[in-house]
């Protein structure tokens, strides 16, 4: 099956059902990282993933990794850590710093080049991309970022510079997200880290069905205002 070359004159994408089985989910190439194209992609269950300096590749894997926030797994050791958690948490206080940290701290190398950082920072200024920050005193030690699509959150990347920083960021975010009506977190591709936190794989067509409904259920504006996140209430 041939891969679709995206047109510079249109933001249209081929159906995710046309994605390759190997490599799993590769659907299209080319285009750009402009806000209209990125939003069109996420609204169709498609995301960019490519190496810096290479052509943009667009993916929609089958199966799809997701996390239902109510199924978030908190281990016994994590619960012990959280009882005396030294961190404070914020939302949308340092998006640029979070995505830069995600770009520099990924063990397997990074796909988050300068062009990707600029594109997602632009989405952040438009109110579509969001970050969670973890602070130890005044130092940023962990966080995550992603894209909101209605009551679905497309998680892109997380980082940790201190013990359990990224895990605690996700736990606090899940509480905040569900409290405002959020229903599903897209993890894209399952890995050992997300699986340990409760992420599972579901068929792509089921994910797309859920996406088609959730994207038309926006969360209240106050969900995404820059704010401190209440850690203690998240653990009740």
UniProtKB/Swiss-Prot annotation:
Q: List the disulfide bonds.
A: none
Q: Name one Pfam family in it.
A: Leu_Phe_trans
Where found in the cell?
Cytoplasm
Gene Ontology terms for molecular function? leucyl-tRNA--protein transferase activity
Among the GO biological process terms of this entry, one is: protein catabolic process
Q: Which reaction(s) does the protein catalyse, per the Swiss-Prot or TrEMBL entry? A: N-terminal L-lysyl-[protein] + L-leucyl-tRNA(Leu) = N-terminal L-leucyl-L-lysyl-[protein] + tRNA(Leu) + H(+); N-terminal L-arginyl-[protein] + L-leucyl-tRNA(Leu) = N-terminal L-leucyl-L-arginyl-[protein] + tRNA(Leu) + H(+); L-phenylalanyl-tRNA(Phe) + an N-terminal L-alpha-aminoacyl-[protein] = an N-terminal L-phenylalanyl-L-alpha-aminoacyl-[protein] + tRNA(Phe)
Superkingdom, natural source: Bacteria
Which InterPro entries does the protein's record reference?
A: Acyl_CoA_acyltransferase, Leu/Phe-tRNA_Trfase, Leu/Phe-tRNA_Trfase_C, Leu/Phe-tRNA_Trfase_N
Cite the EC number.
Answer: 2.3.2.6
- Which keywords belong to this entry? Acyltransferase, Cytoplasm, Transferase
Q: Which PANTHER family match?
A: LEUCYL/PHENYLALANYL-TRNA--PROTEIN TRANSFERASE, LEUCYL_PHENYLALANYL-TRNA--PROTEIN TRANSFERASE
* Function, as annotated: Functions in the N-end rule pathway of protein degradation where it conjugates Leu, Phe and, less efficiently, Met from aminoacyl-tRNAs to the N-termini of proteins containing an N-terminal arginine or lysine.
Q: Which family does it belong to?
A: Belongs to the L/F-transferase family.
In its UniProt entry, what is this protein called? Leucyl/phenylalanyl-tRNA--protein transferase
User: Which gene produces this protein?
Assistant: aat
């Amino acid at each position: 099956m041939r891969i679709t070359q995206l047109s510079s004159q249109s933001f249209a994408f081929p159906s995710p059902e046309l994605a390759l089985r190997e490599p799993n989910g590769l659907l299209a190439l080319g285009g750009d990282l402009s806000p209209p194209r990125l939003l069109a992609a996420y609204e169709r269950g498609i995301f960019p993933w490519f190496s810096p300096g290479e052509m943009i590749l667009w993916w929609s894997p089958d199966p799809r990794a997701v996390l239902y926030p109510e199924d978030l797994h908190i281990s016994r050791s994590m619960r012990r850590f959280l009882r005396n958690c030294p961190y404070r948490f914020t939302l949308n206080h340092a998006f640029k710093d979070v995505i830069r940290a995600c770009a520099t701290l990924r063990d397997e190398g990074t796909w988050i080049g300068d062009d990707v950082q600029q594109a997602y920072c632009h989405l952040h200024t438009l109110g579509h991309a969001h970050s969670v920050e973890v602070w130890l005193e005044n130092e940023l030690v962990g966080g995550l970022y992603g894209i909101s699509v209605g009551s679905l959150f497309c998680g892109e990347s997380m980082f940790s510079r201190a013990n359990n920083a990224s895990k605690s960021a996700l736990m606090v975010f899940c509480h905040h997200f569900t409290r405002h009506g959020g229903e599903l977190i897209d993890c894209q591709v399952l890995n050992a880290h997300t699986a340990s936190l409760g992420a599972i794989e579901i068929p792509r067509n089921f994910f797309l069905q859920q996406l088609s409904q959730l994207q038309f259920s926006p969360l209240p504006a106050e969900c995404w205002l820059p704010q401190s996140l209440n850690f203690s209430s998240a653990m009740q």
